Structures are given as C-alpha cells and as structure tokens.
C-alpha cells in the first residue's frame, strides 16, 4: 500500500507558516555592477558576504519558530544529479535563442561537466564570457571575449531569485507558474518549475498547477506572486499594477473557479510605480484581523470583485466596488460587524515614505501576531508592537537593495488556514 501524499497549500496570509522556499544571495549578486544593476532590477550593488550572513539570520529565525525552510540552491543541487531533470533544464535554458548560435553545444557541455553544486550556482548566477574556458568553443569564445568583453553574459544572472515570492504562488491547494513581467526575471520561473517537477519534496506531494507554463508564450499575461494573497474563506486578493496584468488575472480567475479552488477574487487596481510594484509592498497581513498599509497608495486602490457566474460571458461576474479597498477586504473577511485593524507606515510624511520604500509594510507572518521585518523601519515596527504584534527584525542594509522585505523573500508552500 502506497503512502498517502502530503498535501501542500497556502490557506491564509497569517496562519501558521509550515514550509517555505527561499534563495540565498550568491554568485548572481556578485555579478551586479553599477552599470548593470538597473537592468537587473536592483537599485544598487550589494555587499554579498554580508547579505549572505543576514539572509542566514533570516532563515535561522524562521527555523527557530518551527518553519521548514527549503533553499533554492540546495534544491537545484539535488535535482541536477538526475539526468532527466538536468536534460529538462538545459534543453530549455541552453538554446540558440538564449546563448546564440555557435555556443549551445559548448556551453551545455561545460555545464554538464560541473559538480552539481557549482552547476546550480551557475544556473542562478549566470555564465559570463570569462567563466567558459577558451577550450570550450575555442574560436567563438575568443571572438566573444574580444568584441563583447570578458564580463559580458552568455547567460544573464538571476539576482531576483532572492525574492522567491514572485515566480510562483501557492493558492489554497495548488500553485501558479508565473509569467513574469520583466525579461530579467522570466528564467526564474523555469528553474522553480524544474524543482516542483523533479525534487522529491514535491514529487511526493499532492497539489495542482492552477495556471502558467514556462514553455508557453503568455503574451501580455503577466503574474507575480507579490500581488497574490490567498486570505481564506475561498477569497484571493490580487494586485493589478506594474507587474500583474488583467490578462493573467482573468485567466487565473477562470481556472480557480472551474476547479472549485476559490470562490471570490478581490482585485486591487494599483497605481503603476516602482515603489508600489506589488500589492505586498503597500499592504500585508500581520494577524487574523490586522494589516499594515502605506495609506498614500492604498487609499488610491480601485477594488472590484470577480465571482463565478455561469450566466455571464466567460463564466464570471466583475463588479466594481464603491467602498475603499480596506473596507471591501474587511467586510468580505470579517463581515459587517467587525473591521480590520490597520497599522499605517509610521512617522511623519517623510519618514513614512522612506519606510515604505524600505519595505516597512512588506512583513511576513510566521503565525498570527508574529512577523519578520527589517530593523531600519523603526517607526512602523514600533506601531506594530503597540498593536500587539511581535516583530522579529533582520538587517536591511544589504538585503533590501533589491526592493523586497520578508514577504518578498519567502515563497510559502504550506500555511495553515485561519478561522474567520
């Protein structure tokens, strides 16, 4: 008799966090320079050794609270030892479109000859002209280095893997494989998909794929996990702004409704700006009924509700809401008698804008009433503590340079529901 598969899924934003995936800073971050960090979506270069220490502290503090933390480099190291998994990755990652005609065989051969840990590091960290021995591709590599420079990338690095929240999102009993907005991030989804497809942590688990396929061109449909929050009661909050498009939201809603995975989507129409690139940069749950928000953006959110309706075109009803976003979320979760408690970004207008920029509202809940946030957001952390929230702090000096806090740096895989 076969063992019953473990059920994976995320059923709230503040219930007990059981299992999570992270990605430590590494080679990809050592590739960041003042001339390329903007293209790679970082605001500045980072001190990588310190960032690694700070990230280890982040992981340690989660583990101390009983969270099973999976690290992406380790997961990739495991699966590239499987010939089938390695072939699946390289067939998609090393092509004429990605590395150019004349280098596919050479780059692939070189990668296949690496030790598994080094191979995993290069899959995330990218391959520069100086990495590949001249003996591999001889004349082509010599020409490449001469005209493009030793630091030019044959495969670009993926430093934003640090923000595992975005590439996939677990919604109740399944997961989405997200088509990312920026080209600099699209290869991240491929690697995460490989982990779900081949790693024993996931091959022995029970879950469904709701949406997305890294082998498919999704066109204008883009979806990122920082915009997606399964909050409970069959409700999913989805931000629609800079990174997540209406095209993807509509398709995801259809799929969730058809499979009975969700009952209602609350869409948050966000202003398009880097400071509010995702919903979780201005709004996150800290407890069953407490959220932290950046009011300057949240008050501008235009909410509407999508519900299944077989009498409507495409099987859905879309209803704009007159009430504010916070009022809509509060009523849908708590009913009309209770209201969400709201902690706004702290300090005067200057301090609040600075703390939002430094991810003061981007905290991750480990259980109801316990969150991890950046130490530098002293005003907001103080207000959260006064509201009864335990705030565990980590250093923001290096980790925050890519514009992401504890919420962004975690991809919850198993999280308990909350009783509403």
Swiss-Prot record:
Please give an example of a GO cellular component term from this record. cytoplasm
Q: What keyword terms does UniProt attach to this protein?
A: Arginine metabolism, Cytoplasm, Hydrolase
Q: Mind listing the GO molecular function terms for this protein? A: arginine deiminase activity
**Which SUPFAM superfamilies does UniProt cross-reference here?**
Pentein
- Would you say which domain of life the source belongs to? Bacteria
Give EC number(s), comma-separated: 3.5.3.6
Q: Reaction catalysed by this chain? A: L-arginine + H2O = L-citrulline + NH4(+)
Coiled coil ranges = none
Pathway the protein takes part in: Amino-acid degradation; L-arginine degradation via ADI pathway; carbamoyl phosphate from L-arginine: step 1/2
**Localization, UniProt:** Cytoplasm
What's any GO biological process attached to this entry? arginine deiminase pathway
In terms of InterPro entries, this protein maps to: Arg_deiminase
Task: Please give one Pfam family short name.
Answer: ADI
Tell me what controls its activity. Answer: Activated by Mg(2+) or Mn(2+) and strongly inhibited by Zn(2+).
Active-site residues, record numbering mapped to chain: 408
Q: How does it assemble?
A: Homodimer.
Q: What family is this?
A: Belongs to the arginine deiminase family.
What is this protein called in UniProt?
Arginine deiminase
